[in-house]
Amino acid sequence: MPDLLLELFSEEIPARMQAKAAEDLRRMVTDKLVAEGLVYEGAKAFATPRRLALTVHGIPARQADLKEERKGPRVGGPDAAIQGFLKATGLSSLEEATIQRDPKKGDFYVALIEKPGRATLDVLAEMLPVIVRTFPWPKSMRWGKRSEKPGALNWVRPLHAITATFGLETEEPDVVSFSVDGIEAGQTTYGHRFMAPAAISVRRFEDYEAKLLDAKVVLDPQRRKDTIVTDAKQLAFAQGYELVEDPVLLDEVSGLVEWPVVLMGSFDPEYLKVPAEVIRATIRNNQKCFVVRDPKTGGLAPKFILTANIEATDGGKTIIAGNERVIRARLSDAKFFYETDLKTRLEDRLPKFEQIVFHEKLGTQAARIARIEKLAAEIAPLVGADAAKTARAAKLAKADLLTEVVGEFPEVQGLMGKYYALAQGEDVSVAAACEEHYKPQGPGDRVPTDPVSVAVALADKLDTLVGFWAIDEKPTGSKDPYALRRAALGVIRLITENSLRLSLLQVAGSALAGLHVKSELDAGKLSADLLSFFADRLKVQLREQGARHDLVDAVFALGGQDDLLMVVRRVEALGKFLETDDGKNLLAGTKRASNILAIEEKKDKRKFDGAPDAALYRLDEEKALAKAIGEVGSEAGTAVAKEDFAAAMHAMAKLRPAVDAFFDKVKVNDDDAAIRENRLKLLNEIRNATRAVADFSKIEG
């Protein structure tokens, strides 16, 4: 079947937009093909700085013919309805319609509409210009004299040419005939801007990709990345160094070049006195270059790797010299900033926070730092941290935000705080907390383990969460401007991965007490709402680890479950138990008991609380179940008190035979009202016994 080749050739597309633009082009074209009844075999999109390209293979040469029966008005119906039917179906008279006879509903007119399929080439010529005009660039522009006319094309950068061909692999393809803003689609594209700028005539994708390669254009972004990484590693290795890989920078650099040429430059070793992260940020942010390390020392080497977009006649000497000149100036600035920062102690910067507002309803940064310091000191004994060191770390943790280096490179906040703290003689734990209190900042980020860092990190995140909850600035839908979901996940990971035992409600209460803001929610409602938010985040966390979200609901339904470590352990034990036959059957029996109770409680408008009366037991199965509940309840309660949830589940399993026998032999809704009530109370005892670990009614299945 025929294939489509489409290329949109323009001025340089920003690197950050290329991947999404390629995917958007693929999606828009293939979605429209499917909507037109043209099911394709495969599609792949590509992007370079100067072009978006798409190949779709295995497209039918034409649409299938369609036959449709459209039911009309009743025979003898109103004239207006009949005329509307004729107009909608394109029939000239009722003689062209058939009559469908229905003994019950009567006779109706039916139009048989035959719609011949169109040639795919015509469909493409109609749909492609619409896709170009409606392309979803995040930012676009108009250009030239045509920009003054109504309906002028908007594109990310001036669009120069469109290549569009369609045909079989064994035949000469057809040009898809259309134009956009005076740009006619054709078979012509262009090579590298400097090394092969001449026009190139192409026929289909294989021919197109090969000719571009000859014209110094690597079409596939992944191939450009592979070239950059391979050549950079080899170049570094040849000099005795190792490439410091940077996937984000690699994505960007591969979008800046069509023909990657890797070169190495150098800088004065004197600049290595500046922290490595600052050197890397300087070279990366300003010149989009990679740094290299010396494997002998593990530190950075006074070299950098750049990616040019041309094979220079002088072997790249001029390009290297230009980059060295700029990097020298930037590193000189960074060194000056760093040395200037070292002249001022961190605590001497703190008064400036009095003039910086954290949030209009939550006060200044100075007030926030004071709250974090107080809360961290309260958390310290709960996590085994030294109280004095924790208070000192919390006080200094934000100070580097006012330094010159962090002002220039915000991505090194915290890290620079650590360096400055060490430089002024602070304890190692205090310095580490200055960096680590921001962590973890994402699912793949490292979780601090030093108790001082953990205490400050918890205080920082909980102050943020409680503060924004108090002023009713909670996340809604997809909106989370203050990254509160990330903060909650950070708290969860800090607690669970460090096996910490603490009452979340108690700590949140301390954070709320230190706020001194008027909240629209009372403390109890705020705490309950916040705990529910943590439950939702914990479900997300555990689901990613393969756990069931309903088990989290079942544990939180017990109420007062603010010890997240114990929640996780209950969920783990419950999950393992429910994988066994005993667990599955006990769940079924417990849910059956809960369902019967729900129906009867609704019917009688009352709860069946209280202990059953042993004198009203009529059957051995009732007595056996009552005995089993008593024994299991005691055994499970003892195990839960010891926080041995696996043992509690093992005890629960002993209920299974008695529950199964009860439902097999006992009629719950006995004709005798007293016996019925007693048996319903016995069912309630099953529910209460299993609640030692979780609310089984919340578990699916």
Curated annotation (Swiss-Prot):
It comes from the Bacteria. GO terms for molecular function: arginine-tRNA ligase activity; ATP binding; glycine-tRNA ligase activity. It catalyses: tRNA(Gly) + glycine + ATP = glycyl-tRNA(Gly) + AMP + diphosphate. Its EC number is 6.1.1.14. The keyword RNA-binding does not apply. InterPro entries: DALR_anticod-bd, Gly-tRNA-synth_bsu, Gly-tRNA-synth_heterodimer. It is an enzyme of class 6 (ligase). One of its GO terms (cellular component) is cytosol. Keywords: Aminoacyl-tRNA synthetase, ATP-binding, Cytoplasm, Ligase, Nucleotide-binding, Protein biosynthesis. SUPFAM superfamilies: HD-domain/PDEase-like. It holds the Pfam family DALR_1. One of its GO terms (biological process) is glycyl-tRNA aminoacylation. It is found in: Cytoplasm. Its main location: cytoplasm. Belongs to the class-II aminoacyl-tRNA synthetase family. Tetramer of two alpha and two beta subunits. NCBIfam families: glyS (TIGR00211). This is Glycine--tRNA ligase beta subunit. It comes from Bradyrhizobium sp. (strain BTAi1 / ATCC BAA-1182). The gene is glyS.
